[in-house]
């Protein structure tokens, strides 16, 4: 079955070198995105073995996985994938902002799951720079959506200032 998703990083289509690996599957040489549980259980030895690692933060039914649990591993992670399971679950926005603003993460923050057209720009403003989108989404449509709104009401992880802050300065 062909992949129904494509990866857009920093506004350009990208070949995805990363593989999501479940907790029971042994890691190969390829770069792997693993669960937070596996990172805590095996992270130190995987880092010592020189594995190229990423982690996925799951949203969960009632409460998502705690981004602060990444702190001991953050310098060794190249990718943090944030799950957006349904449109109405916005915890991933806060997770991305915490990673960028409070924890200083400069690697790839990837939105996975229900990553929809009208959310891309807001996700980007919160620090997400990589998006798994449906394979039929054109790069032109993606970049057009990213520039759709020229003003924002709230401050975010990006340098754009909110309308109220611009008005009073």
Question: Over which residues does each language-model region extend?
Answer:
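Glycine-rich phosphate-binding active-site loops on the catalytic face of alpha/beta enzymes
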Residues: 126-146
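Active-site-adjacent beta->alpha loops and helix N-cap segments on the catalytic face
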Residues: 38-46, 87-99, 139-148
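C-terminal helical cap(s) of enzyme catalytic domains, especially alpha/beta-barrels
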Residues: 140-167
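Glycine-rich beta-to-alpha transition loops that act as phosphate-gripper elements at the mouths
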Residues: 109-117
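N-terminal, charge-rich interaction modules
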Residues: 1-42, 47
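Catalytic cores of alpha/beta
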Residues: 55-57, 65-71, 117-130
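Structural preference for beta-strand elements that scaffold enzyme active sites
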Residues: 31-33, 52-56, 79-81, 108-110, ...
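Acidic (Asp/Glu)-rich catalytic clusters
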Residues: 43-50, 67-76
């Amino acid at each position: 079955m062909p992949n129904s998703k494509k990866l857009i990083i920093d506004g350009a289509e990208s070949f995805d070198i990363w593989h999501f690996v479940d907790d029971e599957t042994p890691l190969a040489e390829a770069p792997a995105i693993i669960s937070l549980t596996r990172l805590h259980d095996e992270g130190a030895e995987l880092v010592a073995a020189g594995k190229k690692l990423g982690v996925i933060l799951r949203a969960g039914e009632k409460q998502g996985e705690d981004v602060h649990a990444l702190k001991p591993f953050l310098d060794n992670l190249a990718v943090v994938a944030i799950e957006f399971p349904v449109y109405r679950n916005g915890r991933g926005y806060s997770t991305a902002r915490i990673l960028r603003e409070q924890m200083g993460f400069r690697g790839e923050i990837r939105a996975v799951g229900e990553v929809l057209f009208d959310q891309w720009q807001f996700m980007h403003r919160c620090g997400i720079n990589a998006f798994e989108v449906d394979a039929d989404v054109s790069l032109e449509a993606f970049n057009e959506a990213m520039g759709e709104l020229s003003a924002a009401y709230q401050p975010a992880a990006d340098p754009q200032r909110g309308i109220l802050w611009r008005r009073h300065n």
